[in-house]
Amino acid sequence: MNEHPGFCPACFASLAQEADTCPACGARMADLSKRDYREKIVHALRHPLADVRMRAIIALGLRGEPQTADALVKCAMRHPTDVVQGLEIVNSLARMKQTGAGRTALSILQARHPAHAVREGAARVLAALPSEGEADA
Protein backbone atom coordinates (compact mmCIF):
# COMPACT_ATOMS: atom_id res chain seq x y z
CA MET A 1 0.00 0.00 0.00
CA ASN A 2 1.25 3.48 -0.87
CA GLU A 3 1.50 6.03 1.89
CA HIS A 4 -0.41 9.26 1.32
CA PRO A 5 -0.49 12.59 3.12
CA GLY A 6 -2.73 13.29 6.08
CA PHE A 7 -5.37 14.75 3.76
CA CYS A 8 -7.71 13.05 1.34
CA PRO A 9 -6.53 14.07 -2.15
CA ALA A 10 -10.17 14.38 -3.27
CA CYS A 11 -11.91 16.38 -0.51
CA PHE A 12 -8.92 17.38 1.69
CA ALA A 13 -10.51 15.96 4.85
CA SER A 14 -8.08 14.72 7.51
CA LEU A 15 -7.16 11.14 6.79
CA ALA A 16 -5.21 8.40 8.58
CA GLN A 17 -2.06 7.32 6.73
CA GLU A 18 -3.22 3.72 6.49
CA ALA A 19 -6.70 4.48 5.08
CA ASP A 20 -7.57 3.00 1.69
CA THR A 21 -10.83 4.94 1.43
CA CYS A 22 -11.72 8.42 2.66
CA PRO A 23 -14.40 8.22 5.37
CA ALA A 24 -15.65 11.72 4.46
CA CYS A 25 -16.15 11.39 0.69
CA GLY A 26 -15.62 7.70 -0.06
CA ALA A 27 -12.76 8.29 -2.50
CA ARG A 28 -10.43 5.33 -3.00
CA MET A 29 -6.76 6.29 -2.68
CA ALA A 30 -5.69 3.87 -5.45
CA ASP A 31 -8.11 5.49 -7.91
CA LEU A 32 -6.98 9.01 -7.06
CA SER A 33 -3.33 8.21 -7.70
CA LYS A 34 -4.22 7.30 -11.31
CA ARG A 35 -5.43 10.82 -12.17
CA ASP A 36 -3.65 12.92 -14.81
CA TYR A 37 -0.87 15.12 -13.38
CA ARG A 38 -2.45 18.38 -14.61
CA GLU A 39 -5.75 17.35 -13.03
CA LYS A 40 -3.97 16.77 -9.70
CA ILE A 41 -2.29 20.19 -9.81
CA VAL A 42 -5.52 22.00 -10.73
CA HIS A 43 -7.32 20.15 -7.92
CA ALA A 44 -4.61 21.29 -5.47
CA LEU A 45 -5.78 24.88 -6.06
CA ARG A 46 -8.69 24.01 -3.75
CA HIS A 47 -6.46 22.73 -0.93
CA PRO A 48 -7.10 24.34 2.48
CA LEU A 49 -3.38 25.03 3.07
CA ALA A 50 -2.08 28.16 1.36
CA ASP A 51 1.42 26.75 0.82
CA VAL A 52 -0.01 23.76 -1.08
CA ARG A 53 -2.06 26.11 -3.26
CA MET A 54 1.01 28.27 -3.87
CA ARG A 55 3.04 25.29 -5.09
CA ALA A 56 0.21 24.39 -7.47
CA ILE A 57 0.01 27.99 -8.76
CA ILE A 58 3.75 28.06 -9.46
CA ALA A 59 3.68 24.63 -11.10
CA LEU A 60 0.82 25.62 -13.40
CA GLY A 61 2.64 28.79 -14.41
CA LEU A 62 5.79 26.83 -15.20
CA ARG A 63 3.79 24.35 -17.28
CA GLY A 64 2.27 27.26 -19.22
CA GLU A 65 -0.94 25.51 -20.23
CA PRO A 66 -3.58 28.10 -21.15
CA GLN A 67 -6.41 25.67 -20.41
CA THR A 68 -5.61 26.08 -16.69
CA ALA A 69 -6.11 29.87 -16.73
CA ASP A 70 -9.74 29.68 -15.63
CA ALA A 71 -8.86 27.49 -12.63
CA LEU A 72 -6.20 30.01 -11.58
CA VAL A 73 -8.70 32.89 -11.74
CA LYS A 74 -11.21 30.92 -9.67
CA CYS A 75 -8.50 30.24 -7.07
CA ALA A 76 -7.66 33.96 -6.87
CA MET A 77 -11.32 34.84 -6.41
CA ARG A 78 -11.85 32.17 -3.72
CA HIS A 79 -9.02 33.68 -1.64
CA PRO A 80 -9.37 37.44 -2.19
CA THR A 81 -7.40 38.43 0.92
CA ASP A 82 -4.36 36.34 -0.02
CA VAL A 83 -2.65 39.06 -2.05
CA VAL A 84 0.65 37.18 -2.35
CA GLN A 85 -1.18 34.23 -3.86
CA GLY A 86 -3.13 36.55 -6.17
CA LEU A 87 0.06 38.19 -7.41
CA GLU A 88 1.65 34.79 -8.04
CA ILE A 89 -1.42 33.85 -10.07
CA VAL A 90 -0.85 36.99 -12.15
CA ASN A 91 2.79 35.92 -12.61
CA SER A 92 1.72 32.42 -13.61
CA LEU A 93 -0.73 33.79 -16.16
CA ALA A 94 1.99 36.10 -17.50
CA ARG A 95 4.28 33.08 -18.06
CA MET A 96 1.64 31.31 -20.13
CA LYS A 97 1.50 31.66 -23.87
CA GLN A 98 -0.84 34.60 -24.17
CA THR A 99 -3.74 33.00 -25.93
CA GLY A 100 -7.25 34.31 -25.57
CA ALA A 101 -7.60 32.32 -22.34
CA GLY A 102 -4.58 34.01 -20.75
CA ARG A 103 -5.67 37.50 -21.75
CA THR A 104 -9.22 36.83 -20.60
CA ALA A 105 -8.01 35.54 -17.23
CA LEU A 106 -5.83 38.60 -16.67
CA SER A 107 -8.68 40.90 -17.75
CA ILE A 108 -11.01 39.26 -15.22
CA LEU A 109 -8.48 39.76 -12.42
CA GLN A 110 -7.92 43.36 -13.49
CA ALA A 111 -11.64 44.10 -13.45
CA ARG A 112 -12.95 42.00 -10.58
CA HIS A 113 -10.33 41.01 -8.01
CA PRO A 114 -10.99 42.73 -4.66
CA ALA A 115 -7.29 43.41 -3.95
CA HIS A 116 -5.94 46.57 -5.55
CA ALA A 117 -2.43 45.10 -5.87
CA VAL A 118 -3.74 42.11 -7.85
CA ARG A 119 -5.82 44.34 -10.14
CA GLU A 120 -2.81 46.58 -10.75
CA GLY A 121 -0.50 43.61 -11.34
CA ALA A 122 -2.87 42.19 -13.93
CA ALA A 123 -3.17 45.62 -15.58
CA ARG A 124 0.63 45.93 -15.84
CA VAL A 125 0.97 42.50 -17.45
CA LEU A 126 -1.83 43.24 -19.91
CA ALA A 127 -0.30 46.61 -20.82
CA ALA A 128 3.05 44.95 -21.54
CA LEU A 129 1.56 42.34 -23.88
CA PRO A 130 1.57 43.00 -27.60
CA SER A 131 -1.84 43.82 -28.97
CA GLU A 132 -3.71 40.81 -30.33
CA GLY A 133 -3.06 41.96 -33.90
CA GLU A 134 0.70 42.29 -33.23
CA ALA A 135 0.82 38.87 -31.56
CA ASP A 136 -0.64 37.25 -34.69
CA ALA A 137 1.78 38.97 -37.08
Q: Each PLM stretch: what is its role?
A:
Residues 18-29:
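Cysteine-rich micro-motifs
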Residues 3-7, 23, 32-44, 65-78, ...:
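Amphipathic alpha-helical scaffolding segments comprising HEAT/armadillo-like alpha-solenoid repeats
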Residues 1-4, 18:
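Short metal-coordination and nucleic-acid-contact micro-motifs, chiefly zinc-binding Cys/His arrays
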Residues 48-49, 79-82, 113-115:
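Short inter-helical turns and helix N-cap capping residues of alpha-solenoid HEAT/ARM repeat scaffolds
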Residues 19, 53, 69, 83-86, ...:
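Residue-level detector of extended alpha-helical repeat arrays and alpha-solenoid scaffolds
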Residues 53-59, 87-92:
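Non-membrane alpha-helical segments in proteins
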